[in-house]
């Protein structure tokens, strides 16, 4: 369809290819000397420790440029107070590549409640504070101080999701595009391999960076828009039509049909060009200055942006910032399977740089034996920015490429035990799924392929995933393949054979899934399926677990305080948790990360998923105050005695006193108990071994003995006694998730909404949407989607 796109492995290599492949990309002058380099062509500045592994951005981008023949150096986590650290490798011949790392630096540094974190999984020994706030901006400014005439190419997830004027949760205001604040020359959004290779080769050929205004997947700062583009104005919401002027019924007509003598001549047929030709049309967003003080207009701008994300039919965007024009080119064309295999088939040492010695890097330990099999997500969850970053079209690796990486892990990773920790990506089961109609895919503007029901054109056959799992199990030296990425259970129930394969061979006792909520209001704002879909998956999960003779459990994840969630919704969710014997040790409030639809809801308090109007906009309830956010979080931990006073006060205020007491249908007891807190009951403090656990109670025989609890669960039910609780299960990471093995440092920003972990079966509480299949027109039961982790 786009034959004019040059494959990333078909460019003529730069002359420096004669130096060959480096064991590690150099991080010092001494290493450059050992390689025989007098200078670097490209220097990558990153906020993460340098790990030469394809799940880390600096490695995959560095190795890709190296494969093009360029000499690439790495400056990892430099001291940012002065320019000195940015000059350690000398002046790059072509450009500085600046990235904050695999995670947004603000999400990495602050919790959803804006409290400072004291750890950093991407830093040796988990040490916090090794990168500045707004990392991309600071690094760019220091690079400019070091060498004023060297082009700065901005990339990574932090820059990608801030490419236009955006709401900034941490300062609670709308900020300019990061391209203007950082004073960089060009911004690459998405995974960006295609754009980066083109920029590098054009610079190597002597072209000025200022001339590169037409590269897909880039944003540039211009004085005026290109002349050959037609601009569609979307800066206003309620555009008034021309006023209706009634005609005078008594007016005498001087010309009429009976008086006409002239005969009309035949006119030539002309074909009017489409006004929506993506190649010659751009959409003007409201200016930054207007968005600062107009929340409704901000929601409108967010909606327009999300409608223009299709790489084939989406148009360029232009936004005024003062006297400058921010020009955002069309989204990049997805990589083909051949290109994906090329990127992941490059040489990687698969270990941290030797300069770190024996220091532990938690993010690396988490993904060192996992394999990324695909990119992208068509789920469209409103709180997730994976689609905005990686795209809606799934980019797949071949089975052969994946199997080769499994063998490489077996042979190269120190201490490999034979267990593959994950085969996945943004989600576990979208491998080789997609639209069955290429023409429809090229023109589709739906924000989700699975909400409110699965599109009838979506191929949901999991055959390729099943074949991949079986081939992975047959690799010599591989004892176990675990699926740790979140499963899209709404897709999984379309293929029961996949559920059987997954449950029988690839679940390590617990399986993560993400219903996110139980109530219709929040679920509709999240663009997630109803609990009927969850119940159907749970039935299949339990059925196939029993057939395999295994005791296995679902670990659902929930988000508190998401836009669209009211206090009563959280009470109903808490009742659902209690009725299903779930106790959540660690939960997560909604985190408004840049560019998400849910972030626009949070800021504007209206629904950007539908047409936005000034007159009677669809209001969305938002928990913004600290007290309400604390309450929503506390309700997910209804079993914690420390939360009972707050919950008790809220229930009384809501007129739900009947939920207070010792009866089975009550949520919390009438009086506080002297029983220990959940942290004390598991014999650990805030940083204990079970800190991230979610517990399923009463349903795991014999587990009390494993916990050293011989009393067998004495005490008042649901009063805070944890003696009956089950095993700890893994928690979701914050921000873009390294654990799910996302590609190349652009670990999507699933942000850290999803640390909350709970629930298992639907109850009668609340008004939850039901259904577990395709729309009725497909001949199946109703079904609504979910967004997997």
UniProtKB/Swiss-Prot annotation:
GO terms for MF: 4 iron, 4 sulfur cluster binding; catalytic activity; iron ion binding
Composition-biased stretches (Polar residues): 716-726, 733-763, 778-789
Superkingdom of the source species: Bacteria
Matching SMART domains: Elp3 (SM00729)
Residue numbers spanned by region Disordered: 669-789
SUPFAM superfamilies: Radical SAM enzymes
Residues of the Radical SAM core domain: 363-642
Sorted UniProt keywords: 4Fe-4S, Iron, Iron-sulfur, Metal-binding, S-adenosyl-L-methionine
InterPro entries with a match to the protein in the record: Elp3/MiaA/NifB-like_rSAM, Methylthiotransferase_CS, rSAM, rSAM_horseshoe, UPF0313, UPF0313_C, UPF0313_N
Extent of Basic residues compositional bias: 683-698
Cofactor: [4Fe-4S] cluster
Cofactor annotation remark: Binds 1 [4Fe-4S] cluster. The cluster is coordinated with 3 cysteines and an exchangeable S-adenosyl-L-methionine.
Residues annotated for [4Fe-4S] cluster binding in this entry: 377, 381, 384
Pfam family, one: Radical_SAM
UniProt keyword annotation of S-adenosyl-L-methionine present: yes
Keyword field contains Flavoprotein: no
Family: Belongs to the UPF0313 family.
Protein name: UPF0313 protein VC_1711
Organism: Vibrio cholerae serotype O1 (strain ATCC 39315 / El Tor Inaba N16961)
């Amino acid at each position: 369809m786009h034959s004019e796109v040059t494959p990333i492995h078909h460019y003529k290599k730069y002359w420096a290819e004669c130096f060959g492949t480096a064991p590690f990309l150099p991080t010092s002058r001494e290493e450059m000397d050992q390689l025989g380099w007098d200078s670097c062509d490209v220097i990558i500045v990153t906020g993460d420790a340098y790990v030469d592994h394809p799940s880390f951005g600096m490695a995959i981008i560095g190795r890709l440029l190296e494969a093009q023949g360029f000499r690439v150096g790495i400056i990892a986590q430099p001291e940012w107070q002065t320019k000195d650290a940015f000059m350690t490798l000398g002046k790059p011949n072509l450009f500085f590549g600046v990235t904050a790392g695999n995670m947004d630096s603000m999400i990495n540094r602050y919790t959803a409640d804006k409290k400072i974190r004291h750890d950093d999984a991407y830093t040796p020994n988990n040490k916090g504070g090794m990168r500045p706030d707004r990392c991309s901006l600071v690094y760019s400014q220091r690079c400019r101080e070091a060498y004023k005439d060297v082009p700065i190419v901005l990339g990574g997830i932090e820059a990608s999701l801030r490419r236009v004027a955006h709401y900034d949760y941490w300062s609670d205001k709308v900020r300019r595009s990061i391209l203007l604040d950082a004073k960089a020359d060009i911004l690459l959004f998405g995974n960006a391999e295609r754009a980066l290779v083109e920029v590098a080769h054009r610079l190597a050929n002597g072209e000025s960076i200022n001339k590169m205004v037409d590269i897909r997947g880039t944003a540039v700062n211009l004085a005026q828009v290109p002349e050959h583009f037609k601009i569609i104005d979307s800066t206003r919401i309620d555009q008034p039509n021309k006023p209706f002027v009634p005609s005078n019924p008594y007016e005498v007509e001087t010309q009429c049909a009976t008086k006409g003598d002239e005969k009309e001549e035949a006119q030539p047929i002309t074909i009017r060009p489409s006004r929506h030709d993506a190649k010659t049309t751009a959409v003007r967003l409201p200016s930054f200055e207007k968005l600062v003080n107009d929340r409704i207009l901000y929601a409108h701008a967010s909606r327009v942006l999300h409608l223009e994300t299709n790489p084939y039919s989406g148009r360029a965007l232009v936004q005024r910032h003062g006297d400058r024009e921010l020009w955002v080119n069309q989204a990049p064309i997805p990589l083909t399977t051949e290109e994906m295999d090329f990127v992941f088939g490059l040489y990687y040492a698969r270990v941290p740089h030797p300069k770190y010695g024996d220091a532990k890097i938690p993010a690396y330990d988490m993904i060192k034996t996992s394999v990324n099999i695909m990119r992208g997500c068509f789920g469209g969850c409103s709180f997730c920015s994976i689609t905005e970053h990686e795209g809606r079209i799934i980019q797949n690796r071949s089975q052969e490429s994946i199997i080769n990486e499994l063998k490489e892990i077996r042979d190269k990773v120190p201490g490999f035990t034979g267990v593959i920790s994950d085969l996945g990506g943004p989600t576990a089961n979208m491998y080789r799924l997609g639209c069955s109609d290429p023409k429809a895919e090229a023109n589709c503007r739906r924000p989700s392929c699975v909400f409110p029901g699965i599109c009838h054109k979506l191929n949901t056959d999991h055959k390729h995933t099943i074949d991949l799992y079986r081939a992975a199990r047959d690799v010599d030296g591989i004892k176990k393949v675990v699926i740790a990425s979140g499963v899209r259970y709404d897709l999984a129930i379309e293929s029961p054979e996949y559920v059987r394969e997954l449950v029988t061979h690839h679940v390590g006792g617990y399986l993560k899934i993400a219903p996110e909520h139980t109530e219709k209001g929040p679920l509709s704002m999240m663009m997630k399926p109803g609990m009927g879909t969850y119940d159907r998956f749970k039935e299949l999960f339990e059925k196939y677990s029993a057939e395999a003779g295994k005791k296995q459990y679902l670990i659902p994840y929930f988000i508190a305080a998401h836009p669209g969630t009211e206090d009563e919704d959280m009470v109903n969710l808490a009742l659902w948790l209690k009725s299903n014997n779930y106790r959540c040790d660690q939960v997560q409030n909604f985190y408004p990360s840049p560019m998400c639809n849910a972030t626009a809801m949070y800021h504007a308090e209206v629904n950007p998923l539908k047409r936005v109007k000034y007159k009677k906009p669809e209001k969305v309830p938002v928990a913004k105050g600290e007290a309400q956010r604390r309450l929503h979080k506390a309700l997910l931990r209804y079993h914690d005695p420390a939360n009972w006073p707050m919950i008790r006060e809220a229930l009384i205020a809501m007129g739900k006193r009947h939920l207070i007491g010792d009866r089975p249908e009550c949520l919390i007891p009438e009086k506080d108990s002297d029983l220990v807190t959940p942290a004390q009951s598991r014999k650990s403090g805030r940083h204990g071994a079970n800190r991230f656990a979610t517990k399923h109670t009463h349903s795991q025989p014999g587990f009390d003995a494993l916990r050293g609890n011989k009393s067998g669960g004495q005490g008042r039910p649901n009063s805070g006694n944890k003696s009956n609780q089950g095993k700890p299960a893994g928690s979701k990471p914050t921000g873009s998730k390294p654990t799910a093995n996302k590609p190349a440092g652009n670990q999507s920003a699933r942000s850290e909404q999803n640390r909350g972990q709970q629930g298992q079966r639907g109850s009668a509480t609340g008004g939850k949407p039901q259904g577990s299949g395709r729309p009725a027109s497909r001949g199946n039961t109703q079904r609504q989607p979910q967004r997997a982790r």
